[in-house]
């Protein structure tokens, strides 16, 4: 069963719990600056989660000279093969959404990898603005999904 990561911006309260969960899940000691999901804060308790779209035809993967970005057949995520990456940052420049990040501390590329099929940000979202749902349910409005889960 193929899963879809979905963001409902109407529900985001910009609490930052997803950023912290991501940072801890990826070993950056909870430093929000090292997260793969970022909240664009539009006001108090109003935000837009920004995360890799795992594009069908990803510009980041197309431009990579070493094919270091490949689709994970299980999760559908565009994964980084670190052994192939030459740190040219062409993928960072190519992403039209700004979701490929350069980590100055660790000198590596960062992007959402869906945590190997179990995105750690999702269960920490108190308003269910982030969801990881089966593809066939992805077109359904979030409200019925939440009621079904309760």
Report residues per predicted region.
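Flanking helices and flexible, charged tails adjoining ferredoxin-like Fe-S electron-transfer domains
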Residues: 2-8, 23-24, 28, 34-71, ...
């Amino acid at each position: 069963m193929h899963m879809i990561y979905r963001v409902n911006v109407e529900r985001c309260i910009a609490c930052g719990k997803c950023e912290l969960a991501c940072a801890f899940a990826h070993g950056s000691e909870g430093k929000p600056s090292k997260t793969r999901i970022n909240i664009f804060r539009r006001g108090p308790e109003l935000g837009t989660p920004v995360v890799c779209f795992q594009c069908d035809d990803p510009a980041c993967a197309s431009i990579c000279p070493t094919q270091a970005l490949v689709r994970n057949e299980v999760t559908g995520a565009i994964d980084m093969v670190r052994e192939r990456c030459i740190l040219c940052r062409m993928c960072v420049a190519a992403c039209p959404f700004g979701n490929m990040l350069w980590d100055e501390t660790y000198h590596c590329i960062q992007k959402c990898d869906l945590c190997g099929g179990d995105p750690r940000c999702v269960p920490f979202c108190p308003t269910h603005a982030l969801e990881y749902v089966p593809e066939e349910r992805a077109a359904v409005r979030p409200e019925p999904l939440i009621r079904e889960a309760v």
